[in-house]
Amino acid sequence: MAHWVLLFAAGLFFIIFSTFSLWFIRREYRLYGKLTWLGSVIHCAMYAPHAILSGLIVGGPATLPPMSFGTGIGIFLMIAGWSITLYAMNFFRTFSRWLGNDTPGLTVNGLYRFSRNPQFVGYGIFFVGLYITWWTPLTIIGMLAYVALVYAVARVEEEHLKRVYGQAYLDYCNRVPRFLGLPK
């Protein structure tokens, strides 16, 4: 019973904090054209409730489940997902640029030729691996929560990028899918 109460509380906090974070980030992009230090902290912290919720959903993975084909696939996907995320973030070179505060030019090389949000794709692959490794029926909820969060964040970031880069960004959007797919 206590686990369900904690899970419900974490889920509710995830929804409230994510909604507030998206509102705050959108507001900062519109008012200042970038994120302030507080907006940057909130942007990063926005993913923590999902990670906590995911840990609760899978029961707090303290040890690996018995090795099986599924466990091996899950571990491989977690490693691959983190690798993709870190590789994609490397193209920004600085934390300030990653948060959208340093905008010398549109990043369109590397993994950004195939996805406008490869860091979200990588992080999503990590969570698929996590959920395969520590499968419970609730993992579907965790994945749906992640998809909803990154879709909303991508929409907020795209509004900002359209204002900053104009037609160059719109052309990029026409060539490259938001998350997955082949470039046009």
Where is each model-derived feature located?
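Membrane-anchoring alpha-helices and their flanking helix-loop junctions
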Residues: M1-V108, I125-H160, V164-K184
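Loop-to-transmembrane-helix entry motif
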Residues: S115-V121, F179
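Short, amphipathic, aromatic/basic-enriched membrane-interface segments that mark the entry/exit
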Residues: L106-N117
